Amino acid sequence: MKNRHLIPSLGYCIAVLAWGISCVGPRTLQAQHIHLNAGATNTTQDAQLYFSNGNVYDTNAGYDVYLAFTNSGSFSNLYQGAGVTFAALASTLDNGGPAFGHAADGAFLELQFVSMSGPAGGVFGVWMQDVGNPGSSYLLFTLPVGIGNGTNRIAVSESDGSPGSDPYGHMHGRTFTATQPGLYTLGCRILDTSTNGTGGGPIHTPSGLYHLYFQAGPTISSWTMSSNSFGITFGTTAGKTYYVESTSNLLAPNWMTFAGPFPGNNYLQNVATNSGARQLFFRLRSN
């Protein structure tokens, strides 16, 4: 798949073409599957919920969950990936706890999908594996790009929500999809939907809004440009090697390696150059 962006400015024209997937950056290789662990600041009434490791994987950290294109199965013609599991920290030995930062016993944690930004016309989907047929999945709900008041939720805790129950949860089988290539930004928060708090309400107050990147396919998420310099930012995935190449002529191209090879690591990466050329074309390639 190819994405092309023409950017004229100050008499200077640079075209960017994405031919594969790209990555440049100093970070070390990361695993493709992560766990975001939900807990609370403490276990008292009205203590706020949070992701104990959210700062490692949110947009401020530049981490991206990669979605790869597929043309078969439940996710045919979609970008799909299961690179993140939303978990809840355990309070009991039976579930491997007590973990530091766990929510109060009796809390039932859910993740609310609030907002979505990304490529125009894109739709983000949340799917669940079919227990009776593990080879297939069914759609739970979608979030169109531009939504800012979403109310859909998925359970993070696995308990029955009864008083004193461990808030622990660790459920695999969820897949996330996108209909268009590009960088998607999910806004989400953790809720306690139990009725075991004061007055029959929740024990904990909601978390703040977390923002997470999902990179669908090989695209350039942003670029910067001045009179003699150009920079691009793009998402990556582990297990790939990346090259940034450039040429001054597309009719008779002589592609030269501008940066790379670099290992992918599931973080947004940046490449910048200084050039006096009036026209340059860049492409991003992986193998």
Q: What feature does the model see in each segment?
A:
Residues 217-287:
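Short, composition-biased motifs enriched in small/polar/acidic residues
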Residues 20, 29-31:
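Boundary at the C-terminal end of the N-terminal hydrophobic targeting segment
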